[in-house]
Design a protein with these regions (language model features):
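Vicinal oxygen chelate
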Residues: 42, 86-134
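Short, charged/polar surface micro-motifs in flexible loops or helix N-caps
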Residues: 46-50, 57-59, 82-84
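Core segments of cupin and vicinal oxygen chelate
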Residues: 2, 10-50, 54
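Conserved catalytic-core motifs of GNAT/GCN5-like acyltransferases
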Residues: 8, 28-34, 99-101, 127-130
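Acetyl-CoA-dependent GNAT
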Residues: 54-58, 124-126
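N-terminal beta-strand motif that seeds the catalytic metal site of vicinal oxygen chelate
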Residues: 1-16, 72-77, 125-134
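Mid-chain, well-packed structural core segment of small domains
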Residues: 75-83, 89
Length: 134
């Protein structure tokens, strides 16, 4: 079976975005690339690689500017303590967006936006089909 191990997100400011995810979720910086079309900082929790991307502009072909391209809607982090995670998110500049699901049924997630407006969620129970979701 294939396993999801990499998510890439376009951001406005690489360092600011990296600091946010390092501070809030204790992700480790595992790499950086600076190439002709842009730059990337790679973070990881040891299982999944989160690539933060900043493109230099249009690639010189008929593709739309990557920052405006259709792509991922959001991603999620499983946390040990929902309230503590929310405190850390907001202290680092993230903004609460909305709650989704029913906490009594174990399918609850709390949605936020990072300082660039990228949507992500947190869950104490995980998501259907993952190890943490009962």
């Amino acid at each position: 079976m294939a396993r999801l191990r990499h998510i890439a997100v376009c951001v406005k400011d690489l360092e600011k975005a990296a600091k946010f995810y390092e501070t809030v979720f204790e992700l480790k910086r595992v790499g950086r690339e600076d190439i002709e079309i842009g730059s990337a900082i790679y973070l990881s929790d040891g299982v999944v690689n989160l690539a933060l991307l900043k493109f230099a502009g249009a690639r010189g072909n008929d593709l739309a500017d990557p920052a405006n391209a259709v792509g991922a809607n959001h991603f999620g982090f499983q946390v040990d303590d929902l309230a503590e995670a929310q405190r850390r998110i907001e202290a680092a500049g993230g903004k609460f967006f909305f709650d989704l699901g029913d906490a009594r049924k174990g399918n609850f997630e709390r949605k936020f936006k990072d300082p660039d407006g990228v949507l992500f969620d947190i869950s104490q129970h995980g998501w259907i089909g993952t190890d943490g979701c009962g």
